[in-house]
Regions:
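Glycine-rich Rossmann-fold phosphate-binding loop(s) that bind the pyrophosphate
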Residues: 75-77
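Nucleotide donor/acceptor-binding cores
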Residues: 29-30, 53, 68-70
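FAD-site-proximal beta/loop scaffold in flavoenzymes
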Residues: 38, 43, 49-65, 164-190
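Generic hydrophobic/aromatic pocket-lining and core-packing "Φ" positions
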Residues: 84-85
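Redox-cofactor binding/interface segments in oxidoreductases and associated redox assembly factors
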Residues: 33-34, 73, 159, 163-164
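N-terminal Rossmann-fold NAD(P) dinucleotide-binding loop
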Residues: 80-81
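A Rossmann-like FAD-binding core segment of flavoenzymes
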Residues: 3-21, 25-28, 89-189
Length: 190
């Protein structure tokens, strides 16, 4: 039987757990939590509106939908850099948008990006808005050094935006039960 969990409590005296679901409460000696993590949002205007319709959070899942199209990858870490390289298999052009003046990814991956003819790096840049109709057709960029913005327009549906800025753990049920780090991940000994 599978149900969503509403709450998880631990009895301080017995050490046992009480798991509450919409239909019942279960007493357990141990609980295994495998809630995973959700993609972190970039926070630009239009991100939610176009999620699944021009905005994606997984290059290996959705990259093939952008065969022959331009894609923008938001992020400067290893995942963003590696997925940007993966997207060069499908996309006509991959523009990596990094809010800082450098990528945090491993030097070897950054070097590969810099050597690729399909990749453009836009450092000190953020996407602040995605606009359009049913599918996106414009991107507003901000120069993070000057604060100036400019809009680039494209044919509707001719590009995609991949948001690869980290993940947020689904650890809400664990708050107060186990030690969590500043990002919300359970602290373990290994």
């Amino acid at each position: 039987r599978m149900e969503p969990v509403d709450s998880l409590e631990r009895n301080a005296e017995t050490g046992r757990f009480l798991v509450r679901t919409p239909s019942a409460a279960y007493d357990a000696a141990a609980v295994i939590v495998s809630a995973g993590a959700q993609p972190r949002k970039a926070g630009f205007v239009g991100e939610e509106r176009y999620a699944g319709h021009g905005v994606s959070y997984c290059a290996t899942c959705d990259g093939m939908f952008y065969r022959g199209k331009q894609v923008f990858v938001i992020g400067g870490g290893n995942s963003a850099a590696e997925e940007a390289l993966f997207l060069t298999r499908f996309a006509s052009k991959v523009t990596v948008v990094v809010r800082k003046d450098h990528l945090r990814a491993q030097a070897s991956v950054v070097s590969e990006l810099e050597r690729s003819e399909k990749v453009e790096l836009r450092l000190m840049t953020s996407i602040v808005e995605l606009g359009g109709g049913e599918l996106p057709s414009s991107i507003t960029f901000r120069d993070n050094a000057t604060g100036e913005t400019h809009v680039e327009t494209y044919e509707e549906g001719s590009f995609g935006v991949f948001v690869l800025v980290g993940r947020v753990p689904e650890s809400g049920l664990l708050r107060g039960l186990v030690e969590l780090d500043e990002s919300g991940y359970a602290v373990t000994d290994e």
